[in-house]
Swiss-Prot record:
Protein name (record): Elongation factor Ts
The protein's role, per its UniProt record: Associates with the EF-Tu.GDP complex and induces the exchange of GDP to GTP. It remains bound to the aminoacyl-tRNA.EF-Tu.GTP complex up to the GTP hydrolysis stage on the ribosome.
InterPro entries for this protein: EF-Ts_dimer_sf (IPR036402), Transl_elong_EFTs/EF1B (IPR001816), Transl_elong_EFTs/EF1B_dimer (IPR014039), Transl_elong_Ts_CS (IPR018101), UBA-like_sf (IPR009060)
Gene Ontology CC terms: cytoplasm
Entry keywords, A to Z: Cytoplasm, Elongation factor, Protein biosynthesis
Family: Belongs to the EF-Ts family.
Pfam families: EF_TS
Species annotation: Bacillus anthracis
Main location: cytoplasm
Compartments in which it is found: Cytoplasm
Coiled-coil intervals: none
Annotated GO MF terms: translation elongation factor activity
């Protein structure tokens, strides 16, 4: 398989490894991106890939709570400038209020619902598009619930570039729930605890760490012990309750939550545009297209 410059660029962004190392890794793995990441890690060249795609889309996240119901949503725009527009800000609040009150199962169902003004959600968004002059997209939302004995923690970072909604069970301490949400915004854990990590993911990591230790020339008899130690660090990186609490690194998040008399029921973290990559036009093609368009 031909290794392209774009593939090398993507691998560099995912791993931080050098260009020649990335090219070699892709060549050795026949262009398989995930295997190339493992190859670099086994050689000790790259750290564990965060697997978070480059964030390129614009827009905002927003959180709305009402009693025991909470909602987090993401509304995309084409530019950051429009996301700061008053009309955009009004639209996202109107959508949040509607979604929380009507609880559609998904975006498709939401778009077909009728708002208080008598218009379909899709029609309401299209009217905003006509006024603002940019494509706007209701990308996703999630509705969560709690009981009177629980607390929501809502946190918007950088005005909504990142949004986190937590549910602290068995405690009504909203400040504590928000502190956990702030930690999640900063550290971006994948799971609540180790029990949530699949056996397949743990085994894959164990294999990579084993090969890494062997490539370092460590004696086989101590490799297993080394791998278990490194697996502990792996869990700390991806599991919320195992992480050092951002506001007090001397304690784990688990200890902080327990000190408040509660347990963490769940969390949702949205970062604007994650998993969306803007199309990168070739500059020469762009110039050619402009020239052709002027004829």
């Amino acid at each position: 398989m031909a290794i392209t410059a774009q593939m090398v660029k993507e691998l560099r962004e995912k791993t931080g490894a050098g260009m020649m190392d990335c090219k070699k890794a892709l060549t050795e793995t026949n262009g398989d991106m995930e295997k190339a990441i493992d190859f670099l890690r086994e050689k000790g060249i790259a750290k564990a890939a965060k697997k978070a795609d480059r964030i390129a889309a614009e827009g905002l996240t927003f959180i709305e709570t009402n009693g025991n119901d909470g909602l987090i949503l993401e509304l995309n725009s084409e530019t950051d400038f429009v996301a700061k527009n008053e009309g955009f800000q009004t639209l996202i609040k109107e959508l949040a209020a509607h979604l929380l009150a009507n609880k559609p199962a998904n975006v498709e169902e939401a778009m077909a619902q009728t708002m208080e003004n008598g218009k379909k959600v899709e029609e309401h968004i299209n009217e905003a598009i006509a006024k603002i002059g940019e494509k706007l997209t209701l990308r996703r939302f999630e509705i969560v619930s709690k009981t009177d004995a629980d607390a929501f923690g809502a946190y918007l970072h950088m005005g909504g570039r990142i949004g986190v909604l937590t549910v602290l069970e068995g405690s009504t301490d909203e400040a504590a729930a928000k502190d956990v949400a702030m930690h999640i915004a900063a550290v971006n854990p994948k799971y609540i605890d180790r029990d949530a990590v699949t056996a397949e993911e743990v085994e894959h990591e164990r294999q990579v760490l084993t090969q890494q230790a062997l490539n370092e020339g460590k004696p086989e008899k101590i490799v297993a012990k080394m791998v278990e130690g490194r697996l502990g660090k792996f869990f700390e990186e991806i599991c919320l309750l195992d992480q050092a609490f951002v506001k007090n690194p001397d304690m784990k998040v688990r200890q902080f939550v327990e000190s408040k008399g509660g347990t963490l029921k769940g969390f949702v973290r949205y970062a604007v545009g994650e998993g969306i990559e803007k199309r990168e036009d070739n500059f020469a093609e762009e110039v050619m297209n402009q020239v052709k368009g002027s004829n």
